[in-house]
Curated annotation (Swiss-Prot):
It comes from Conus pennaceus. Residues 1-22 form the signal peptide. The cysteine framework is V (CC-CC). It is found in: Secreted. The keyword Secreted applies. Residues 23-48 form a propeptide. Expressed by the venom duct. GO terms for molecular function: toxin activity. This is Conotoxin Pn-B01122. GO terms for cellular component: extracellular region.
Amino acid sequence: MRCLPVFVILLLLIASAPSVDARPKTKDDIPLVSFQDNAKRALQILSNKRYCCYFDYSCCLYLR
């Protein structure tokens, strides 16, 4: 039971500590959102190509 107050105090100290990034941010860092947007855009283009090319080959020429 003696350890419980010490444990609670340690938890409070850890929770109130300022969060620090593991490495400093540089100008070359790109937000994760842009990677997700690029992935969604690429998947959308590929799915449009598959659907369109299945029915009409001439459509594939415009989706490049």
